[in-house]
Each structure stands twice: as structure tokens, then as C-alpha cells.
């Protein structure tokens, strides 16, 4: 038998697929988005950009921007009673009202 892969993208076939009209690299504006501390944002992974990509388990999670680390943003949210922080590039985040 073969061994199961254990890479960071394993088990993410449905999460990281893009529709035909959205394939390819994102626009420059998408990569240069800015957020303020306190803004609400959702994690929407763009599979064309591997830099600053959060783990695919966090796809669709909504949280609050709490700061920056380099050119990436720190997104805080709760899972049950546990406070979690994810570092993600702006291309993988979408503003939420």
C-alpha cells in the first residue's frame, strides 16, 4: 500500500479549487488590500498565492484583525472557549461587515 501524504495542502482538494473564471493570479489590488485593527475579516484562501496562506482548516472562519506581523495580518477568533490567532496575507482575507 502507499503512504498517505502529510503536507500542508493534503486533504484540501475541494477547499482550494477555483472556478474557471477565477483561475490564475489575483489582481494587484487584491494583494495590496489594507485592514485596520478592529476590522472584521473572513479567511478566504486563494490557492494561487502560497505565501502567507493559513491552514485550510481555517477556511471560512471570521474574526477580528488584532495587528500586523510583517506584511501579514493577525486574525483572532474563538473556537469554543479557546482564543486562536492566525497569521494570513491580505490576499487570503476578505472584509466582513
UniProtKB/Swiss-Prot annotation:
<comment type="similarity">
    <text>Belongs to the eukaryotic ribosomal protein eL21 family.</text>
</comment>
<protein>
    <recommendedName>
        <fullName>Large ribosomal subunit protein eL21</fullName>
    </recommendedName>
</protein>
<dbReference type="InterPro" id="IPR022856">
    <property type="entry name" value="Ribosomal_eL21_arc"/>
</dbReference>
<keyword id="KW-0689">Ribosomal protein</keyword>
<dbReference type="Pfam" id="PF01157">
    <property type="entry name" value="Ribosomal_L21e"/>
</dbReference>
<keyword id="KW-0687">Ribonucleoprotein</keyword>
<dbReference type="GO" id="GO:0005840">
    <property type="term" value="C:ribosome"/>
</dbReference>
<dbReference type="GO" id="GO:0006412">
    <property type="term" value="P:translation"/>
</dbReference>
<dbReference type="GO" id="GO:1990904">
    <property type="term" value="C:ribonucleoprotein complex"/>
</dbReference>
<dbReference type="InterPro" id="IPR008991">
    <property type="entry name" value="Translation_prot_SH3-like_sf"/>
</dbReference>
<feature type="region of interest" description="Disordered">
    <location>
        <begin position="1"/>
        <end position="23"/>
    </location>
</feature>
<dbReference type="InterPro" id="IPR001147">
    <property type="entry name" value="Ribosomal_eL21"/>
</dbReference>
<dbReference type="GO" id="GO:0003735">
    <property type="term" value="F:structural constituent of ribosome"/>
</dbReference>
<dbReference type="InterPro" id="IPR036948">
    <property type="entry name" value="Ribosomal_eL21_sf"/>
</dbReference>
Amino acid at each position: 500500500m502507499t503512504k498517505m501524504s502529510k503536507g500542508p495542502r493534503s486533504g484540501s482538494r475541494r477547499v482550494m479549487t477555483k472556478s474557471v473564471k477565477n483561475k490564475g493570479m489575483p489582481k494587484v489590488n487584491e494583494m495590496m488590500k489594507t485592514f485596520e485593527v478592529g476590522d472584521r475579516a473572513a479567511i478566504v484562501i486563494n490557492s494561487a498565492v502560497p505565501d502567507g496562506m493559513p491552514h485550510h482548516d481555517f477556511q471560512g472562519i471570521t474574526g477580528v484583525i488584532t495587528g500586523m506581523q510583517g506584511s501579514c495580518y493577525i486574525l483572532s477568533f474563538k473556537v469554543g472557549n479557546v482564543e486562536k490567532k492566525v497569521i494570513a496575507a491580505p490576499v487570503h482575507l476578505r472584509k466582513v461587515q
